[in-house]
From Swiss-Prot:
Subcellular location, principal: cytoplasm
Entry GO terms, CC: cytosol
UniProt protein name: tRNA (guanine-N(1)-)-methyltransferase
Alphabetized PANTHER family for the sequence: TRNA (GUANINE-N(1)-)-METHYLTRANSFERASE
Subunit structure: Homodimer.
Entry EC no(s): 2.1.1.228
NCBIfam families: PRK00026.1, trmD
Annotated family: Belongs to the RNA methyltransferase TrmD family.
Main EC class the enzyme belongs to: transferase
Keywords: Cytoplasm, Methyltransferase, S-adenosyl-L-methionine, Transferase, tRNA processing
One MF annotation (Gene Ontology) recorded for this entry: tRNA (guanine(37)-N1)-methyltransferase activity
InterPro entries referenced in this protein's UniProt entry, alphabetically: Alpha/beta_knot_MTases (IPR029028), tRNA_m1G_MeTrfase_C_sf (IPR023148), tRNA_m1G_MeTrfase_TrmD (IPR002649), tRNA_m1G_MTases_N (IPR029026), tRNA_MeTrfase_TRMD/TRM10 (IPR016009)
Catalytic activity: guanosine(37) in tRNA + S-adenosyl-L-methionine = N(1)-methylguanosine(37) in tRNA + S-adenosyl-L-homocysteine + H(+)
Length: 233
């Protein structure tokens, strides 16, 4: 998979994309991430990418021209261009608090695409006409951040985990919280007893069937207690 990230702060991505599983996925060439500086497409001598909002109001708005040129540089065609296989089209995402809340089902679908183009907004957001070139707006929660870079990192990390070869044990992904609309079951490691706190006896039984049943029960119990809304999906 190729991911193009359009941002005015490219330096923010240096650490998160070179460590852990994401860094290894890039080394294995499972994942290719291209950080594109939107300012490099500004025709202003000061590389300005924002301007005042028509109609007045506080805050600045990201200009359309440099955003358009940055988007086109990734190979994106018209928004409604047809492809024999829809997952071969570059899928353009704008990280926005007004978008759909990121979920496991969204991530699974995004992982099917060959190329994602992620736009990171700033200030009061982007010129609304940018939406003519965007396939979907995605949010990571009902709160406001200083920009779209951190949400973009969340999207990249969660999507990359779904790609074959990124997580060594595929079963680890399938047993994670939300994968089947259930939270994950409790995990324990050595020692079996710590300051009087013992792990459940069933985990020491060696009976894989009983262990599996216990995990399903605990997963359901935890979901019912903490996220009952997931059971309604």
């Amino acid at each position: 998979m190729k991911i193009d990230v359009l941002t005015i702060f490219p330096g923010m991505f240096k650490g998160p994309l070179t460590e852990s599983l994401i860094g290894k996925a890039i080394e294995k060439e499972i994942l290719k991430i291209n950080i594109i500086d939107i300012r490099s497409f500004s025709k202003d001598k000061h590389k300005k990418v924002d301007d005042k909002s028509f109609g007045g109001g506080c805050g600045m708005v990201m200009k359309l021209e440099p955003l358009y040129d940055a988007i086109k540089s990734t190979g994106v065609k018209k928004k409604n261009s047809t492809y024999k296989n829809p997952y071969t089209k570059p899928y353009v995402i704008y990280m926005s608090p007004q978008g759909r809340i990121l979920s496991d089902s969204i991530v699974k679908n995004l992982a099917k695409f060959k190329q994602l183009v992620i736009i990171c907004g700033h200030y009061e957001g982007v010129d609304e006409r940018t939406m003519n070139y965007v396939d979907e707006e995605i949010s990571i929660g009902d709160y406001i951040l200083t920009g779209g870079e951190i949400p973009a990192m969340v999207l990249i990390d969660s999507t990359a985990r779904m790609l074959t070869g990124v997580v060594k044990e595929k079963s680890s992904v399938k047993n994670d919280s939300f994968y089947n609309n259930l939270l994950d079951y409790p995990h324990y490691t050595r020692p079996a007893v710590f300051k009087g706190y013992k792990i459940p006896e069933v985990l020491l039984s060696g009976d894989h069937k009983k262990i599996s049943e216990w995990r399903v029960q605990e997963s359901y119990k935890r979901t019912k207690e903490r996220r009952p809304d997931l059971l309604k999906k």
